[in-house]
C-alpha cells in the first residue's frame, strides 16, 4: 500500500530552512575532514523542491493516537538541490623550464610553487533515493528515521572545477561516500532534533517531568552555581537549539559523584557482594556465581573426599545413590531448576547391596585361618532360600569335603543340620538346589562366627 503527500512545498517555511541549514552545516563539519579542505563547509542554499517522495507501506508494527511504528519503501527522484561553499588547497606542480623560446609561448601562469587556497562552490542536484526506512513516531519522544540499507542511487555533483576532469571525478566519488554516511548517521539525528522542536512548539502542555535531586554535600543550589545551559524544559529541546560547529550533538555536564543514575548503578554493584559465600550460608555441592574458579575446585575436591571417607568398606553404593536419571547433582544447586529439578525434591533412599565372595579351596592343605569372605552384617533369621541365586555357578555335592578342608566344630554342624530340615519341610528347597543351599548355610554360620 502506498500514498501521496499533498502540499509538499507548502509544508516548509523559511524558519524551517534556516534551522535545517544550521543543523546540516554542523553535521558536515563534524569529525575529521579531508586534507584538501582548508575551511569550514557552509550550506549556502537548500531547496527540497515541489516533488515529494513516494512511500510504500511494508509493515505496521504499532499504531496508536500518540505513537506509530512502521516499515516503508522510500523512492525519491525529485529536483531537490544543495549548494555548499568551502575553501580547498590546490596541489601545485613544479613544472620544469622548457627549452622553447619565450617568443613562441604565451605568457600565462602554468602552476604555482606554493600552496594556494582556492574558494569552491559545490552543487548537489538530481538526487535519486531508493531504500527501506524504519519510521518510529512518538508524541513524547519525537520522530526516529533509520535506513536499513544504502538509499543513494545517484547524484549529480557540479563544482567550480568541472573544467578539470580529474578533479571532477574525485569530487563525485568523495561526495557519494559522504552522502552515504550522512543518510545513515547524521540525518536520523537531525530529524529527531527538529521533531522535538515541532512538538514542543505545537503542544506546550506536553508533560516532560524532571526528577528532583539534592546533592548530599549541598542542601540547596545557589544562583552562582546554576548552569544557564541546563534550562528547565523538554529533554534535548534547549540543547538542540544550540549549535556547535565542532560538536553538533551537545550533551550537558554529568557529575559522576552526585548524579542519581550513577549512584544507583554503584549501589547495584555493591549489592552483588551479598551473593558471596563469605556473607551467605554455605550450601554443600553448590556453585556460587561470585565464587572464584580456584575456590570452586578446592570446595568440590574437599567434599568429594569427605563422601568417599564416610562410605563403609563392607557396603557398595551405586551411582544412583548420588545421581538421579535426570539430575546432574544429588544436592541442592543453583542450576537445579534449569535441569528440571524441583526445589522440594525428596532425597533418594540409600540402597545397600550385600556382596558375598566365595574363594575355592586349593588342593594343598588349607590353613585354619582360611574362611569364606562375606558381609558381616548378615541376619541369621533371614530365609536362606531368598539368597540362593537362580542359576548357581557351582554345585557342591560332597559336604564331607568342606569338613576336611575347613575347621568346623560339631556345634556348628548341628545348627546347620537343624536349619536344613526346617527349610525342607516348608517346601522352599528343591532337589537341584539342595547342595547350594547347604553351602550357603555353611557360609552364613562361618560369617556369624567371624562377627563375634
Swiss-Prot record:
| SMP-LTD domain ranges (all copies) | 1-196
Q: Which domain of life is it from?
A: Eukaryota
This protein's species is Schizosaccharomyces pombe (strain 972 / ATCC 24843) (Fission yeast)
Q: Which GO terms describe its molecular function?
A: lipid binding
Q: What does the entry's domain section say?
A: Lacks alpha-helical transmembrane segments, suggesting that it resides in the membrane via beta-sheet conformations similar to those predicted for other outer membrane proteins and porin. The SMP-LTD domain is a barrel-like domain that can bind various types of glycerophospholipids in its interior and mediate their transfer between two adjacent bilayers.
Look up keyword Membrane and say if it applies. yes
Q: Where in the cell is it found?
A: Mitochondrion outer membrane
| Any single GO CC term annotated in Swiss-Prot or TrEMBL for this entry | ERMES complex
The gene name reads mdm34
Q: Which HAMAP family match?
A: Mdm34
Membrane association type: Multi-pass membrane protein
Function, in words = Component of the ERMES/MDM complex, which serves as a molecular tether to connect the endoplasmic reticulum (ER) and mitochondria. Components of this complex are involved in the control of mitochondrial shape and protein biogenesis, and function in nonvesicular lipid trafficking between the ER and mitochondria. Mdm34 is required for the interaction of the ER-resident membrane protein mmm1 and the outer mitochondrial membrane-resident beta-barrel protein mdm10.
Q: How does it assemble?
A: Component of the ER-mitochondria encounter structure (ERMES) or MDM complex, composed of mmm1, mdm10, mdm12 and mdm34.
This chain's protein is named Mitochondrial distribution and morphology protein 34
Record's family? Belongs to the MDM34 family.
Q: Which UniProt keywords apply?
A: Lipid transport, Lipid-binding, Membrane, Mitochondrion, Mitochondrion outer membrane, Transmembrane, Transmembrane beta strand, Transport
InterPro entries per UniProt: Mdm34, SMP_LBD
What processes does the entry annotate via GO biological process terms?
intermembrane phospholipid transfer; mitochondrial genome maintenance; mitochondrial membrane organization; mitochondrion organization; mitochondrion-endoplasmic reticulum membrane tethering; phospholipid transport
